[in-house]
Amino acid sequence: MARYFRRRKFCRFTAENVTEIDYKDIVTLKNYITESGKIVPSRITGTRAKYQRQLARAIKRARYLALLPYTDLHNK
């Protein structure tokens, strides 16, 4: 019987010594939203609580300024 190996989650922001997550950094923010536009939870990404709050705030600001979409493209 094969053993399933789960890779340990780690916080990328802690590893890179990020002080604050910027709402203008769209490339980073896109990694933390789903295809439908939802914010990915920290239990999936491994992000620490401090950075998850900053991430959510930055994504919401970017959405408000139309830098990120609220939802997907709704292609039919």
Swiss-Prot record:
InterPro entries tied to this protein: Ribosomal_bS18 (IPR001648), Ribosomal_bS18_CS (IPR018275), Ribosomal_bS18_sf (IPR036870)
Entry keyword set: Ribonucleoprotein, Ribosomal protein, RNA-binding, rRNA-binding
GO molecular function, one term: small ribosomal subunit rRNA binding
GO cellular component: cytosolic small ribosomal subunit
GO biological process terms on file: translation
Disulfide bonds, paired cysteine numbers: none
One of the Pfam families matching this protein, by short name: Ribosomal_S18
Family: Belongs to the bacterial ribosomal protein bS18 family.
Description of how the protein assembles with itself and partners: Part of the 30S ribosomal subunit. Forms a tight heterodimer with protein bS6.
Role played: Binds as a heterodimer with protein bS6 to the central domain of the 16S rRNA, where it helps stabilize the platform of the 30S subunit.
UniProt-recorded name of the protein: Small ribosomal subunit protein bS18
Organism, as annotated: Aeromonas hydrophila subsp. hydrophila (strain ATCC 7966 / DSM 30187 / BCRC 13018 / CCUG 14551 / JCM 1027 / KCTC 2358 / NCIMB 9240 / NCTC 8049)
